[in-house]
Amino acid sequence: NSPDEVLSWLEQVDPTRIVLALDVRLDVAGVPMLTTHGWQQTSGVVLWAAVERFLRSGLTHVLCTDVARDGALTGPNCELYAEAVRRFPELQWQASGGVATARDLVALRDCGVAAVISGKALLENKISSQELRPFLPNASSLASM
């Protein structure tokens, strides 16, 4: 809710070590708008404009949550993330919201997302450790799961 403050942080530290987390809700035209106040309010700021502003400071990582899908296990908004990667290929995008199956992980990887946040699907064992192995660089550590 304080972009100038975040920009000052990016100036004070190595911006490649910060992940900018942005929550969005699609408006009626399908435009991703930033949400605030625990997702209760839409800020009136378009995701793409916000990212552009922070990009100039050396930002390299963005976590984007589609709040309409978060915790719903309805599948991720691959169109949103593919558009994000298309618009800003220099960024490492992290997708959050809606992941329900290993197929969702494949779909997000295929659209260019660098990382995925999955909570409910893992907590409810919708994705097995065996299904996760291809996505983890240290998969041998899963042997104890």
Specify the residue positions occupied by each region the protein language model found.
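Conserved anion-binding
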Residues: 1-70
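Catalytic cores of alpha/beta
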Residues: 1-10, 79-118
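Secondary-structure boundary/capping motif
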Residues: 1-2, 72-76, 124
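C-terminal helical cap(s) of enzyme catalytic domains, especially alpha/beta-barrels
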Residues: 6-12, 106-145
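Short, well-ordered secondary-structure micro-motifs
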Residues: 30-37, 73-76, 105-107, 128-129
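Charged helix-capping and loop-helix junction motifs
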Residues: 43-48, 74-82, 133
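Glycine- and other small-residue-rich loops at beta-strand/loop junctions that grip anionic moieties
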Residues: 65, 70-73, 94-98, 120-121
